[in-house]
Amino acid sequence: MQLMQVQNLSKCYRNGDGVEHLSFSIQRGEIVALLGPNGAGKTTTIRCLTGLYKPDKGDILIEGSPPGDINVQKKVALIPDQPYLYPALTAAEHIQFRARGYHPGKKDVKERVYHALKEVHLEEKANQLCGQLSRGQKQRVVLAGAIVQDALLYILDEPTVGLDIPSKQWLSNWLKTKTDQGCSAFVSTHSLEFVIETADRVILIRDGKLMQDLYVPQFEEQAEWRKEVIRLLGEWSDE
C-alpha cells in the first residue's frame, strides 16, 4: 500500500541549487534511502516532504493529503541531523512534553513515555538531563518522541553522522523493526554502507536531479553504478 507519492517536485534558490522534477513513492513498511553527495539536494527534499519548505512545482501527497495538513503532520516524524533537545529537561520529561503536544488530554502519557524509552533501550537514562547525554543517546530520545507521536513515516536526515559502529547497527535494526510493524522510513544519507545494510530501495540524486531509483539488490548487482556512486560520495561511509 502506498504511503507517500512525490510527483515532479522542484524547489530552486537564487543561486540555482535545489531539486528538479523529483518523482518517487514510498510504500507502507518500506525503508527508502535518499543517497547523494553533499549539496545534492537531500536536505531540500526532506524539508519539502515535511512541509518546512513549499515546493515551487510538483505535488507531495501522504495518504492522499499534502504535508501541511494537520493530520499528516501527526503521522510524520522528522529526525534531524542534529538532535535538538531541551538541555535542562530529563529524557523522560522531553518525551512527555512531545506526547502531550500530540495527544493532549491522554491519561496514559507516562505509560507511553516508559514504553518508548524501553523500545529505544534508554529506560536507565529516563531521569538524566538531556544536556548530559551522548549524541547517540540524544538521537534515541528524539526517536522515542516520534514513537509517542504514533508516527507512520519516519524521515531521518543524515542519522549516522557522529555515531559509533554499535549505534549505527542499533539504528539499522530499529528501523527494520519499525517497518515490520507497518511504519515506513525515508533516510537521507551519504553512507552507502548504511544504505546497503538497512534500506529496501535507494534513490540516487546528484545536483538536485534523480539519477536512479532501484531496489538495493538491483543496485548491488550493478557494479558500474556502485563505482560511480562511490566516486561521487568520495568515500565508502561517513565514519
UniProtKB/Swiss-Prot annotation:
Ordered alphabetically, the record's keywords are:
Antibiotic biosynthesis, ATP-binding, Bacteriocin biosynthesis, Cell membrane, Membrane, Nucleotide-binding, Translocase, Transport
Q: Where is the ABC transporter domain?
A: 4-232
Where would you find this protein in the cell? Answer: Cell membrane
Q: What does this protein do?
A: Probably part of the ABC transporter SkfEF involved in the export of the bacteriocin SKF. Probably responsible for energy coupling to the transport system.
Q: Which GO terms describe its cellular component?
A: plasma membrane
Q: Quote additional remarks.
A: Accelerated cannibalism by skf- cells is seen on solid media but not in liquid media.
Query: Matching Pfam families, A to Z?
Result: ABC_tran (PF00005)
- Which EC numbers characterise this protein's activity in its record? 7.3.2.3
Q: What membrane topology was assigned to this protein in its record?
A: Peripheral membrane protein
The source organism is: Bacillus subtilis (strain 168)
GO BP annotations listed? bacteriocin biosynthetic process
Q: Which reaction does it catalyse?
A: sulfate(out) + ATP + H2O = sulfate(in) + ADP + phosphate + H(+); thiosulfate(out) + ATP + H2O = thiosulfate(in) + ADP + phosphate + H(+)
Under which name does UniProt file this protein?
Answer: SkfA peptide export ATP-binding protein SkfE
The molecular function GO annotations come to: ABC-type sulfate transporter activity; ABC-type thiosulfate transporter activity; ATP binding; ATP hydrolysis activity
| Phenotypic effect of disruption | When the skfA-skfB-skfC-skfE-skfF-skfG-skfH operon is deleted, increased rate of spore formation; a double operon deletion (sdpA-sdpC plus skfA-skfH) makes spores even faster.
